Regions:
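Helix-turn-helix
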Residues: 20, 24, 28-67
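Hydrophobic alpha-helical connector segments
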Residues: 66, 79-115, 169-176
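Hydrophobic/aromatic residues within well-ordered alpha-helical segments
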Residues: 17, 60, 71, 98, ...
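Amphipathic alpha-helical packing segments from all-alpha helical-bundle domains
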Residues: 100, 112-126, 133-160
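A short secondary-structure junction motif
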Residues: 74-78, 82, 116, 132, ...
Length: 220
């Protein structure tokens, strides 16, 4: 009985150290990238020794790969896009086939896109994807395409409810993304713009106004 308890305690301790290492590594890699992050710095932040890190991970490459590919997981989407009913429960605007709903969809998109973590993640992916190709693939699949898929589902839902037979939701989503990003994303990415709630709302309002006009002008 004591032996079993001892093994359980040891396993819990190992798991706790693993979590501490992963969390510290995530912070350092998002801030400094692969080359800029040091194992000494990660160990210090995790409260462990460098030797302990190497008992959990074979090398820096393995640690980076595991941590950053995990960071490329959108927990809202899991593996697949949820059905419309689930999206409607998660986002009140998904039920609205209105310009206001479109604006709220844009605001949600921008809140995610312009969050500090997502901007940092994109910088790391563009910097290190050549060394870690799977990182780029996972980012494209789980982050970029995932959020676009929500917009496609929403715009398809609007077209269905409005009986807009000629609308192509995929093309409309690409256009709306471009309007939302215009004059904002690049500036935020390079630290020239702080994406506060007011700036996000202003951008979403402007983009949705233009997009709604386009949708209703040639609605089919």
């Amino acid at each position: 009985m004591k032996t079993a308890a001892k093994h359980t305690s040891k396993a819990a301790m190992i798991a706790e150290k693993d979590r501490a290492i992963v969390l510290a590594a995530r912070e350092h890699f998002l801030r400094d990238g692969f080359a800029g992050a040091s194992m000494d710095g990660i160990a210090k932040s995790a409260g462990v020794s460098v030797k302990t890190i190497y008992t959990h991970f074979a090398n820096k490459d393995e640690l980076f790969s595991k941590v950053m590919i995990a960071a490329c997981t959108d927990h809202l989407l899991s593996q697949e896009l949820p059905p419309d009913e689930v999206l409607a429960e998660r986002f009140a605007w998904f039920r609205e086939a209105t310009q206001r709903g479109l604006m709220e969809a844009g605001r949600e998109y921008l809140r995610h896109l312009l969050s500090e973590e997502q901007l940092a993640l994109y910088r790391v992916v563009t910097r290190d994807a050549d060394r870690f190709p799977e990182l780029g693939r996972q980012y494209q699949k789980n982050i970029s395409q995932g959020r676009t898929s929500i917009l496609i589902a929403y715009l398809r839902n609007i077209a269905r409810r409005k009986s807009w037979a000629k609308r192509d939701a995929t093309q409309d989503a690409a256009l709306y993304e471009a309007l939302l990003r215009a004059g904002t994303y690049e500036e935020a990415l390079h630290g020239l713009l702080t994406a506060n709630p007011d700036a996000i709302e202003k951008q979403a309002r402007s983009a949705s106004k233009t997009m709604w006009k386009l949708l209703t002008t040639d609605c089919g």
